[in-house]
Amino acid sequence: MPRWSAAAAVVAAAALADAASGATAQADHPDWGINGTYTATSNGEWARKNDFFYEQASRRSTWTVNTMCSYPGECTGTVSSDENWTAPIYSRSWIWYVKHPIDNWVPCPDGSTAPGLQTFRFKAMTPDGANADPSSTTLVGEDTTIGPSGACGASKAVYINMPFKLVKIG
């Protein structure tokens, strides 16, 4: 039997043995996701509006997060906030993203409003925020909300960015 045929036979036998034993690939690993209840804090003291410091009210809410992961750092799920919104959550390369629309976010001089899109981007860090730590229950990043260019008759988008922190509480 040629050498490559013997190797192919060994690989095929191993595959059949796995199939016969009922072994299956695990698509979700609970340690890869972020599941549970978290305190979400957006620090308005360090907010920027269109790249200039512009103090905003800080916001604190409670999130319930449910995720499933196909690979480490590749996850999807849902976030439910006690501020009465639910949005998808996903991660790419250990960075998490949550995006949700906000109705009537930009007030216009004529009394009308325009919507905004709020995006949270964060990753697991040491509690002091100095180093990445995938096993940490403290996640830090940014909370960015953008209003559409052209809203209120102005051709410049409204952009507010502030530091963000997510801490597991349950």
Residue ranges and their predicted role:
Residues M1-A27:
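Secretory targeting and sorting signals
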Residues H29-F53, V79, L139-D143, L166-K168:
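Tryptophan-anchored aromatic micro-motifs
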Residues I34, S61, I160-M162:
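Residues that flank catalytic or metal-binding motifs in active/ligand-binding sites
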Residues E45-Y54, V106-T113, G147-A157:
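Flexible, membrane-facing loop/turn or short amphipathic-helix motifs
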Residues Q56-T126:
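Predominantly extracellular/secreted and cell-surface proteins with exposed
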Residues G116-G150:
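Internal, hydrophobic beta-strand segments that form the core of beta-sheet-rich folds
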Residues V140-G170:
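Edge beta-strand at a domain terminus
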